[in-house]
Amino acid sequence: MRNSSKKHLDLPYRLGVGMMILNADNHIFVGKRIDTKLSAWQMPQGGIVPGETPSIAAMREMLEEIGSDKGYIIAESKCWYSYDVPSLLIPKLWNGNFRGQKQRWFLIRFTGNNEDININTSNPEFDQWRWASLDELLSIIIPFKRKLYQAVVKEFKSLIQ
């Protein structure tokens, strides 16, 4: 076990983006992951394609994950945030090449309506979605991402209220 832990720590982080998508009521889009039986809710996120800027990646990922790009960027995080996935998940994610993700986060105002959202995309990541209040967000998020989400909420909170 010690060797696998060391191996885990030697792996790099995958570069990506995360999106805190707000509706008109300042509720946040969360989706329930399709690839687990756990109640794993999260905000949309994804990788950065080589040559792509983080802001372009965020809008592309928004379209890929919620089926709509109706929105605009309010703010970009001041730093990169990272999280490690549990070591048991590493072989199942990203071909086992990464220990977790290092992400630039974006606060996005969704300008569409609920009917514009379609999670049944060509490569769906969610089987359910809903709008969550800022107060409930941290309680429903998958635990290994909670510390990152706390930091993102702290950075963007003054822009939401």
Swiss-Prot record:
MF annotations from Gene Ontology: mRNA 5'-diphosphatase activity
Domain Nudix hydrolase: 12-154
EC number: 3.6.1.-
Pfam families per the UniProt record, alphabetical: NUDIX
Gene Ontology cellular-component annotations: cytoplasm
Cofactor(s) needed by this chain: a divalent metal cation
Swiss-Prot/TrEMBL GO biological process terms: mRNA catabolic process
Annotated keywords: Hydrolase
InterPro entries on file: NUDIX_hydrolase-like_dom_sf (IPR015797), NUDIX_hydrolase_CS (IPR020084), NUDIX_hydrolase_dom (IPR000086), RppH (IPR022927)
Motif stretch (Nudix box): 46-67
Function in brief: Accelerates the degradation of transcripts by removing pyrophosphate from the 5'-end of triphosphorylated RNA, leading to a more labile monophosphorylated state that can stimulate subsequent ribonuclease cleavage.
NCBIfam families, alphabetized: PRK00714.1-3, PRK00714.1-5
Family: Belongs to the Nudix hydrolase family. RppH subfamily.
PANTHER family reported in the protein's UniProt record: M7GPPPN-MRNA HYDROLASE
Name of protein: RNA pyrophosphohydrolase
Encoding gene per record: rppH
